[in-house]
UniProtKB/Swiss-Prot annotation:
Keywords: Amino-acid biosynthesis, Cytoplasm, NADP, Oxidoreductase, Proline biosynthesis. It comes from the Bacteria. One of its GO terms (molecular function) is glutamate-5-semialdehyde dehydrogenase activity. It comes from Agathobacter rectalis (strain ATCC 33656 / DSM 3377 / JCM 17463 / KCTC 5835 / VPI 0990) (Eubacterium rectale). Catalyzes the NADPH-dependent reduction of L-glutamate 5-phosphate into L-glutamate 5-semialdehyde and phosphate. The product spontaneously undergoes cyclization to form 1-pyrroline-5-carboxylate. It is an enzyme of class 1 (oxidoreductase). Pathway: Amino-acid biosynthesis; L-proline biosynthesis; L-glutamate 5-semialdehyde from L-glutamate: step 2/2. The gene is proA. GO terms for cellular component: cytoplasm. This is Gamma-glutamyl phosphate reductase. CDD domains: ALDH_F18-19_ProA-GPR. It holds the Pfam family Aldedh. It is found in: Cytoplasm. Belongs to the gamma-glutamyl phosphate reductase family. GO terms for biological process: L-proline biosynthetic process.
Length: 418
């Protein structure tokens, strides 16, 4: 048995005990883990500095370095995230339904842990603590396979988290980090279906598609975010400008950032210059269709869009701009190019708002609000394991309940089937 298989086998062996831990023990571990992160701040931040320096030497994108970087405030946020998870109600053991059959059988549906969760992710150290917290609270063992860019940071974080397990006499097989960074190990991990119940990829389109195509373990896709804001002909201009500015520039490197603007032709000539002036404060580049380019002619950072722009998740200070002649055309365009993540309409027309809500195919659909709210904390779920863009098992921000399954519990008094 090689090192990878042993990690997976140990988690599989521990899954029953972890799945039946008392809530008080789980909460104690999570609070201790939060304390340990802060106690290990020096070691974690020094490890992170090494990873960031390597990324900068390798000329990695600014958006990637932003996701990778930790400081005191971000580490404090990770610790607070664990404490918030500890405060959430424990879903494990919840009786979801109970009914008595005519033959006297009492059949109940009880929420249980999934078992062993595998997570493959890129340069997001906060995923390490969030994933542990959510999986542990729901009685799951978790095996993490982070990207090479964050390896030193992840090792330091996992060391601090594991101490909370061992100090509370809980098997440290509840949390494992695959430290090998080679692609062969990742490919082998994706095929450990005899031990791992579900695999969740967190990262860019390339990573997610690689996992979906090659894994033999069931996959929950946490998709890329080609998110749109459609500005309807009856939109409030100031509201639309503020929403788009927030959705794009508050944090560019996240999957719920807006990447594309769709504008009704009836207002485009008046609205687009106002929007341009606001986005110009952040040096946002606009890749425009022919009509939008004509309206913004002569302005800096305005270029012609290519066919690739409409489906692009930039994660950068770049947006595509499309002008349409109707809400139907807007919906058709968005459904054709979106990634089923988060889409928004800005409008004062109730009927158009309802049409957009009903016909847009996405996990999160907004009326008059920023797509940046697609987040477990903002939805009141606590931390999230990711935002699912698929329709089976989980969709949208994945909180605690998304990391559970259920079993049927049947009480009898000697019944036999005739």
């Amino acid at each position: 048995m090689n090192d990878l298989e042993k990690i997976c086998a140990d988690a599989y062996e521990a899954r029953v005990k972890i799945g039946t831990l008392d809530t008080d023990i789980k909460n104690k571990v999570l609070n201790d883990a939060a304390d340990n992160l802060l106690k290990a701040e020096k070691e974690i931040l020094e490890a992170n500095k090494r990873d960031v320096a390597t990324a900068e030497e390798n000329m990695k994108a600014k958006s990637m370095i932003d996701r990778l970087s930790l400081d005191h405030d971000r580490l404090l946020g990770m610790a607070d995230g664990l404490r918030q998870i500890a405060k959430l109600a424990d879903p494990i053991g919840e009786v979801m339904s109970m009914a008595k059959r005519p033959n006297g059988l009492i059949i109940g549906k009880r929420r249980v842990a999934i078992g062993v969760v595998g997570i493959i992710f890129e340069a997001r150290p906060n995923v390490t603590s969030d994933a542990f917290g959510l999986c542990f609270k729901t009685g799951n063992c978790v095996i993490l396979k982070g990207g090479s860019d964050a390896i030193n940071t992840n090792i330091a974080i996992v060391k601090a988290l594991k101490k909370a397990l061992t100090d509370n006499l809980v098997s440290d097989a509840a949390l494992a980090l695959i430290e090998s960074t080679d692609r062969e190990t990742t490919n082998a991990f994706m095929k450990m279906d005899q031990y791992v119940d579900v695999l969740i990829p967190r990262g860019g389109a390339g990573l997610i598609q690689n996992v979906v195509k090659n894994a033999t373990i069931p996959v929950i896709q946490t998709g890329t975010g080609n998110c749109h804001v459609y500005v309807d002909k009856d939109a409030d201009f100031d509201m639309a400008v503020n929403i788009i500015n927030n959705a794009k520039t508050q944090r560019i490197s996240v999957c719920n950032a807006c990447e594309s603007i769709v504008v009704h032709s009836a207002i485009a000539e008046e609205f687009l210059p106002k929007l341009y002036d606001k986005l110009r404060e952040h040096h946002v580049q606009l890749h425009c269709d022919e009509r939008a380019q004509a309206i913004l002619a002569g302005r800096d950072d305005v270029t012609e869009a290519t066919a690739d722009d409409w489906g692009m998740e930039y994660l950068d200070y770049i947006m595509s701009v499309k002008i349409v002649d109707s809400i139907d055309e807007a919906i058709e365009h968005i459904n054709r190019y979106n990634t089923s993540h988060s889409e928004a309409i800005v409008t004062n027309d109730y009927d158009n708002a309802q049409k957009f809500l009903n016909e847009i195919d996405a996990a999160c659909v907004y009326v008059n609000a920023s797509t940046r709210f697609s987040d477990g904390n903002e939805f009141g779920f606590g931390a999230e394991i990711g935002i699912s863009t698929q329709k089976l098992h989980a969709r949208g921000p994945m909180g605690l309940e998304a990391l559970t399954s259920y079993k049927y519990i049947i009480y009898g008094s000697g019944q036999i089937r005739e």
